């Protein structure tokens, strides 16, 4: 049976007392305020407290595998709907949910249709999906994930690209030095964006850096990426251009001739997708393609009691045989561009 709990690497930046203004002392107050519920936690060198943890269900490398999220109170949450977009709105610092760590191939993503939106591996034609290694790249070349509480609206034609949204949370690539873990929630600073046109849909790729990265104080906009990460933007465009070719698909196209837009432009796009998400999570009836079940958005008709969210986790498939990943996943593909 597999029900392993791991800890997020995203930590609170302030002590509990400063978060609340005052610390309740009565047992009733402590019980009613989730921020004071004591949970086992991993600490960084600065002894900051983890805000999120993950729970694995099902067998790894199988369709049953799911990675659920809990907040620091131990409540099951949706990483798409219950984790705030902003870690610090005043400083324009965002939360990023890591779906795919750097150098890995499994195409993991927030499951839009599954209640509480766990991370699952994408399946196509009955098989688990792995991203091909296109020479000279190995797997994903950055930490890859999504910004919570965003949604690229498929009914909206983006004026700057002329294409509709792709019906997903907005994607983000994190370029810092650390290889993150699946399910990590990072605080990131946005540097810019690339506009991938994937099968006729706008698929923004936000470029960001973990605020705890040693270079975070030096990179503040897209021009800084070329200075401190020379070659990375060029490699990023190449990666997105060719990564589907080994699967028999044509090379991807880009808006703006593949040029990256700056941080201000990216922040505007993020704000727009956040508004689309707000409409999504509050719309009635619920979207047929996306589960909007959540526990924190009180004005949403799709909010559920935390006990019901816990039941969803408890009823998720558990156990099973861990499956081996085929050696062919490590194949290097050499691409001839036309």
From Swiss-Prot:
Reaction(s) catalysed by this chain's protein: diphosphate + H2O = 2 phosphate + H(+)
E.C. numbers: 3.6.1.1
Keyword Iron: no
Keywords: Chromatin regulator, Cytoplasm, Hydrolase, Magnesium, Metal-binding, Nucleus, Transcription, Transcription regulation
SUPFAM superfamilies named among the record's database cross-references: Inorganic pyrophosphatase
Record's subcellular location: Cytoplasm; Nucleus
Chief site of localization: cytoplasm
Cofactor: Mg(2+)
Domain of life: Eukaryota
One of the Pfam families matching this protein, by short name: Pyrophosphatase
GO molecular function terms noted in the UniProt entry: inorganic diphosphate phosphatase activity; magnesium ion binding
Residues annotated for Mg(2+) 1 binding in this entry: 166, 171, 203
InterPro entries for this protein: Pyrophosphatase, Pyrophosphatase_sf
One of the protein's GO biological processes: positive regulation of DNA-templated transcription
GO cellular component: cytoplasm; mitochondrion; nucleus; NURF complex
Class of the enzyme per the UniProt entry, highest EC level: hydrolase
Binding sites annotated in the UniProt record for diphosphate: 129
Residues the entry annotates as binding Mg(2+) 2: 171
Miscellaneous comment: The ATPase activity of NURF is stimulated by the presence of nucleosomes rather than by free DNA.
Biological function: Component of NURF (nucleosome remodeling factor), a complex which catalyzes ATP-dependent nucleosome sliding and facilitates transcription of chromatin. NURF is required for homeotic gene expression, proper larval blood cell development, normal male X chromosome morphology, ecdysteroid signaling and metamorphosis. Inorganic pyrophosphatase (PPase), hydrolyzes inorganic pyrophosphate to inorganic phosphate, essential for driving critical biosynthetic reactions including transcription, replication, and DNA repair.
Subunit and partners: Component of the NURF complex composed of Caf1-55, E(bx), Nurf-38 and Iswi.
Entry similarity comment: Belongs to the PPase family.
Name by which UniProt lists this protein: Inorganic pyrophosphatase
